Amino acid sequence: MRHPLVMGNWKLNGSRHMVHELVSNLRKELAGVAGCAVAIAPPEMYIDMAKREAEGSHIMLGAQNVDLNLSGAFTGETSAAMLKDIGAQYIIIGHSERRTYHKESDELIAKKFAVLKEQGLTPVLCIGETEAENEAGKTEEVCARQIDAVLKTQGAAAFEGAVIAYEPVWAIGTGKSATPAQAQAVHKFIRDHIAKVDANIAEQVIIQYGGSVNASNAAELFAQPDIDGALVGGASLKADAFAVIVKAAEAAKQA
């Protein structure tokens, strides 16, 4: 049985005061939660502080991006080795904001995936279609292409222990969300697509939903059989709202 994972992506938000307050409150809100893994991805400069604040809890740390290179003359970049050194485990790659604003390609993202696996870190591979692609009926085509960038270069085994986050671009930060049935249909397609290569890997891979997940829609989303948690944006900046989502995942998967 897959163990759900709810991960908070703080994006470009944070301060020392916020890290202290938010992680302290998360510790209180999530005390006693054991049926759902929890991770947070603050901006890089706050990962170490957040890790110290989370010490003794079940909250794990992640990061929002990684460079291909492990060291060298690459100004402004952060390597997988560095993230590992400061205790980040779950590393988000391929987020639509990176694909859009930084023109990251499927090929580049697949290379980042490989580097993370080599370093023993957990890739959180974001995939999903734009509103135009959705309206053109290309959701499955886009998701398959983004997954195939890894499948065809690294094989299905690369997805062992990895996480996929389906994030319909039209639902990120817009307040819109795919209906539970819509999200489930895409999640099932993703799992079935990997199963064509390796059914065992497909069955164990965690597939999160990431599109305006909030306290009011979380329980219904998590009741779907192929939705294994969430990659949460705005709601992860409020301890009480994030905790409701985590507890909804725990309850749904124990039911």
UniProtKB/Swiss-Prot annotation:
The keyword NAD does not apply. CDD domains: TIM (cd00311). One of its GO terms (cellular component) is cytosol. Disulfide bonds: none annotated. It is an enzyme of class 5 (isomerase). Disruption phenotype: Cells lacking this gene accumulates methylglyoxal and are unable to grow on glucose, lactate or other carbon sources. Substrate binds at residues 9-11, 173, 212, 233-234. Its main location: cytoplasm. The active site is at 95 (electrophile), 167 (proton acceptor). GO terms for molecular function: identical protein binding; triose-phosphate isomerase activity. The keyword Cytoplasm applies. Pfam families: TIM. Induction: Induced by CsrA and repressed by spermidine. NCBIfam families: tim. This is Triosephosphate isomerase. It comes from Escherichia coli (strain K12). The lineage of its organism: Bacteria, Pseudomonadati, Pseudomonadota, Gammaproteobacteria, Enterobacterales.
